């Protein structure tokens, strides 16, 4: 085991290099770290370590376990590592002052500062994110982004039992609330001692900007309401999204829908997501264009995308807000029984929108994906939700990130796809493959046996996985991209002028 003093010196050295602290802070920081380890003396160590940041942090955690300061459990180790890094961080007020000092130079400089801080403090878990499998694969709608999510470690049975038997707390109320800032964490609530948020004013309401601890794309940020209020999509949503992009034109932002099945995993706290990433949907081609009376300064088109989406372009924020609100209100009450679209069932609302905003070539671009959460006997999880035949790949809600063409697929697929590759190479029998994958594996075998002389196996499986994800998205489209669906889409856009 490494010497504690040498590890402390190494972590301080790394943090100075990462601009978390300055040389002047060395003695103070060292003493605060010694206190965490119940030590009250320090002897300089001749041994100079060259460990990486995460290696150093992990070795410090091992010493804490050895000294019985913490348990050898994931939640306990995470809490302790956040306590360590919190020592290196300024208070929220100082971070906000620095952010806005840099914002006066440029919006990008301010987000670069906060993003770097969030990584250097280990709030963004870059070590775990690096485990994800990411690749791009072609599809009939363009190149899709595929991620197999391996970043979130699994809890062991002991921790699961501890969580099940622990006393439930309503503080913080949810994973997003402002009360998470600096929160120690428990077996049931993640560590947040090293968590900081930037205060934003969007349309006379206070919002918080933070980065996601488990990024799915570059600079994946979350913009959350200061108040714990439910998700909603209305005119204020469009005002907020456009206001955010106006303040940070190098970022996109968007919102999950506000209804179950088609919404995200957290409906209880109003929030948006954003970041510095170009998604496959951004490059979707025009399906047809149309106009809306009274909005001559707004370009309107439907795009060729599996989830039915209207794209608006313009320079005037007020016009885009009002045009988006008109489309939302029309869609809320729109029914087309020939396409299984019903706005209400016994007063239960079914129609909503997943909106996204970005700035491109001097204009704001607003994408409005039309969603419906109705269920049926044939599709009890949702008519416009991934159907049963694709559940072996993805059965969870299709939220904002997936709508834009980035698949976030379960970690189990990593081993399961390797088995399928072994089957395609004739190394194992079909019986060795999970039962829910077998129909797909048989289908792939027929294709690959025909193509294998000219096709790389990994590329083939990646492309077929991408095609399966496209099917997931197509199931969610309210206006299918066939003649009947296209006519239905045009009926809806025509109704915007009635």
UniProtKB/Swiss-Prot annotation:
Q: In which pathway does it act?
A: Carbohydrate metabolism; galactose metabolism
**Keyword Zinc belongs to the record:** no
Pfam families linked: GalP_UDP_tr_C, GalP_UDP_transf
The record's listing under PROSITE patterns reads: GAL_P_UDP_TRANSF_II
Provide the primary localization: cytoplasm
Query: What stretches pass through the bilayer?
Result: none
Protein's UniProt keywords contain Magnesium: no
Gene Ontology biological process terms from the UniProt entry = galactose metabolic process
Enzyme Commission designation: 2.7.7.12
* Domain of life the protein comes from: Bacteria
- State the compartments where it is located: Cytoplasm
Q: What catalytic reaction does the record list?
A: alpha-D-galactose 1-phosphate + UDP-alpha-D-glucose = alpha-D-glucose 1-phosphate + UDP-alpha-D-galactose
**A Gene Ontology term for the protein's cellular component:** cytoplasm
Q: What are the GO MF terms of this UniProt record?
A: UDP-glucose:hexose-1-phosphate uridylyltransferase activity
What's in the keyword line of the UniProt record?
Carbohydrate metabolism, Cytoplasm, Galactose metabolism, Nucleotidyltransferase, Transferase
Q: Which family does it belong to?
A: Belongs to the galactose-1-phosphate uridylyltransferase type 2 family.
Q: What is this protein called?
A: Galactose-1-phosphate uridylyltransferase
